Amino acid sequence: MYHADLHTHTIHSDGEYTPAHLGLMALQSGIRYLAYTDHNYSYSPAELSDLRLQFPMLRILRGCEFSCFYRTADQRRVEIHIVGLNFDPDCPEFQAVLRRNQPDRRSYVTKILNKLDALGVGIGTYEDLMAFCNGPQHLGRMHIARSLVTHGYVKTVDEAFDIYIGSFGQRLAYVESELDYAPIEDVLSALQKAQGIAILAHLFFYPLDDAEQHRLLRTFKALAGPCSGMEVYYGRYTDEQRCHLAALAAQYDLLPSAGSDFHGPGDGNATHDGGLGHHFPASVYEALEARQREVYGVVHD
């Protein structure tokens, strides 16, 4: 039986593995449909062509996880993530959003590092963190979490988020994002113009109560149009959470999507052995692609 994973990360953003290594893991895990969805990064045609030549048994999909901002009813600014699939990478509106979503992260990351240092759990400077992570294009909290593990302050990446840098939990060194990402309206408009699939990622990760979750879903559906979905099958979610998300997806006419959000073996979204072996049904992707063909008459490679 084939499987799908439509939400993964590599060293192009905050993942631990190269795209080729991730492709090999997917192949060994029985995955048929694999989307590389690095943060605010679009793979070049040459990169995808090389990966498809290496892994002809995989259906490798063009993807990107967009950061964007959403305004709540009380005008709070909440960072939301949207997975885009099978879009036209040459669409001018898409390119404009991608350029907008490349802010300088030094100030934001440095503020977190300074808070950690004040707590006595210092992991060095911005330059030290860059060196530790081998100069990634997208330096962020996942890299800080791994450094906290390496320095022995916490045992796992999840513990680093729960105690220090996550949006929930103790938030001892949490810093509100100041990065100037595009608003949700611009991201979803760009994905429609690029004839892509828009998927609302990990609904339970956002600091929203039930009423605001429903408001976000209504807004997302209205802006995303018919070629849209939301993550129902997700790495760390329980069966009960998935059932709840499936009901919400049906209520708002959003197709269910499936993604591990895999970053590496120390990630809470990895399988028990640190791998990429979540058995999400391939039919989930096939339904998304069928909707894209119905709406746009094309599936972009």
Residue positions per predicted region:
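An N-terminally biased module of ancient metal coordination in phosphate/nucleic-acid-related enzymes
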Residues: M1-E79, G166-Q170, L179-D267, A287
